A protein has these predicted regions:
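Second-shell loop/turn segments in exported
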Residues: 106-114, 158-164
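An anionic, turn-rich surface loop/hairpin at beta-sheet edges
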Residues: 127-150
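Short amphipathic alpha-helices in soluble, non-transmembrane regions
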Residues: 121-128, 173-179
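Bacterial N-terminal signal peptides that target proteins for export
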Residues: 3-18
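Short, compositionally biased low-complexity segments enriched in polar/charged residues
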Residues: 68-104, 116-121, 147
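A short, solvent-exposed beta-edge/loop patch
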Residues: 142-183
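Bacterial signal peptide processing site
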Residues: 32-35
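C-terminal motif of bacterial Sec signal peptides marking the signal peptidase cleavage site
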Residues: 26-30
């Protein structure tokens, strides 16, 4: 009798482990691998500005006080200079930042038009993060360090850049937003 019970327990543990693994894989399929790589083609379609708002609300008071989105003059006029890529690569986008320029804080979410361009957009945001580090390196080392600790992550057809006091929390907020948008 003990043998049967232990076999049942082992089977139950195996089933539970399998269910947990499947749920992790299902989430990863919507947001690429845990390294931020692009996904298998799942497409989410929500306004990038909604993602930015959700993230900035989740991270709280970070010095970010302005948000612009694709279609607004501040976004359209500055996109190529800030990110070094053509606006034609994205179908939507928004970024939030500290308008005083006193901090490196920035949250950017871009919806990429073609899956083939995700890596190019991701690289552009990584370059932007490095540029922010250089911008503050000479006179505000704490802001340069913040930029150095920033996160760039691809989820579905979106690419995220988070530079703030807790970039891991910003990344988590982005992933949570995208997970809810995928459902």
């Amino acid at each position: 009798m003990k043998i049967k019970r232990s076999k049942c327990m082992a089977a139950a543990k195996c089933a539970l482990a399998s269910a947990l693994l499947l749920s992790v894989l299902a989430f990863a399929a919507g947001c690429g691998g845990t390294d931020g790589s692009k996904d298998d083609g799942n497409v989410i379609n929500v306004p990038a500005s909604d993602a930015v708002t959700s993230i900035t609300e989740a991270i709280g008071d970070s010095g970010i006080d302005s948000t612009v989105k694709k279609g607004q003059a501040d976004f359209d006029d500055n996109f190529k200079d800030l990110y070094g890529i053509s606006e034609d690569l994205i179908t939507d986008g928004a970024f939030a930042y500290d308008s005083t320029g006193a901090s490196a804080d920035e949250i950017t979410v871009l919806r990429v038009g073609k899956n083939d361009d995700i890596d190019k957009v991701k690289q552009a945001l990584e370059t932007r993060m490095s540029q922010r580090q250089q911008d503050f390196g000479g006179y505000k080392p704490e802001e340069a360090a913040k930029a150095s600790d920033g996160k760039v992550f691809a989820c579905s057809n979106y690419v995220f850049l988070g530079i703030c006091d807790d970039s891991s929390a910003a990344r988590s907020a982005f992933m949570k937003f995208m997970q809810s948008a995928a459902q």
